[in-house]
């Protein structure tokens, strides 16, 4: 999970939501540092291939680089991995490695479908008001997918 998702969720006091959706949530040290501390229940694990991280750093931020490098390592080790990434370039790179991805908005839609939240619209509006970037088109699409009517 990248820091933008964690920060966005924390601004609406929902940083533990991913723990309800996944059996375990792993973040690398760079994401923990960008977030500004630990989150109860999250596992902090550094990627072992620092060369891979440094190569990714040529194109991405520290958090996204460590998330993708760690995702590659875990998936090669046989784990079922889904990366939570919002940055478009990071998403493209993760997909090029064959990794499964979802963004913060997708996480909210899944949470509603699973019965953990009542309204994607209300949470996204709160997140946007606190500085979370979500284009009008993505907002509209999220409301549509969450079956919450037109905006």
Which role does the model predict for each range below?
Residues 3-82, 88, 97-99:
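Active-site-proximal, substrate-binding regions of enzyme catalytic domains
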Residues 30-32, 91-151:
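Acidic, PIN/NYN-like endoribonuclease modules and their adjacent C-terminal/linker elements
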């Amino acid at each position: 999970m990248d820091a933008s998702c964690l920060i966005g969720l924390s601004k609406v006091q929902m940083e533990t939501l991913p723990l309800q959706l996944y059996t375990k949530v792993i973040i690398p040290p760079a994401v923990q540092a960008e977030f500004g501390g630990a989150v109860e229940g999250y596992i902090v694990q550094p990627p072992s291939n620092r060369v891979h991280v440094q190569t990714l750093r040529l194109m991405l931020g520290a958090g996204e680089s460590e998330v993708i490098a760690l995702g590659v390592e875990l998936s090669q080790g046989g784990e079922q991995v889904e990366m939570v990434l919002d940055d478009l370039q990071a998403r493209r790179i993760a997909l090029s490695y064959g990794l499964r991805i979802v963004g913060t908005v997708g996480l909210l839609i899944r949470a509603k479908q699973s019965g953990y939240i009542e309204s994607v619209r209300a949470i996204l509006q709160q997140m946007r008001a606190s500085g979370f970037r979500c284009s009008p088109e993505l907002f509209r699409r999220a409301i549509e997918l969450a079956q919450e009517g037109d905006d």
